[in-house]
Amino acid sequence: SLKERKLFVQMQIANLQNKEVNIIGAGLAGCESAYFLTQNGVKVNLYEMKKIKKTPAQKSELFGELVCSNSLKSTEPLSASGLLKLELEKLDCFLLKVAKNCAVPSGNSLSVDREKFSKIITNEIKNNKKEVVTK
């Protein structure tokens, strides 16, 4: 159940107090992890390679850059991606909130303004006063 999952996560977070967590990569997973951990009092070191070298698909130094498509797929609850969004919403997913804030019209899917999406993520992570260090 959701209640049991939240309790399990709280117990795991308690084990990380007074420790530092290193996260490699400021893509979607790295940013969500960094944000979640810092909101729960864990110090995070977030390492991103773009300052040194970008891949051919990467165009900016922003975090959470969507390189292939601006679509985060269906919002229909009977689809796998739609159901996942409902679950992420219940778990208070940082990136889902940002995505909804940056949404552009696209029918029954969640599509975002890619630049706005990445700028908000980058600003939230870099300006987080809860112990996130970007390198």
Task: For the regions a language model picked out, list residue spans one by one.
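Conserved beta-strand positions in the Rossmann-like core of class I SAM-dependent methyltransferases
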Residues: 45
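Extreme N-terminal leader/targeting segments of oxidoreductases
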Residues: 11-21
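N-terminal amphipathic/basic-hydrophobic helices that include classical n-h-c signal peptides
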Residues: 1-10
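Fold-independent oxyanion-binding glycine-rich loops
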Residues: 26, 48-49, 135
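N-terminal Rossmann-like FAD-binding beta1-loop-alpha1 element of flavoenzymes
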Residues: 21-42
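Conserved active-site and cofactor/substrate-binding residues in soluble primary-metabolism enzymes
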Residues: 28, 79, 83-86, 112, ...
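Feature captures the FAD/FMN-dependent oxidoreductase FAD-binding
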Residues: 90-135
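N-terminal FAD cofactor-binding segment of flavoenzymes
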Residues: 36, 40, 48-96
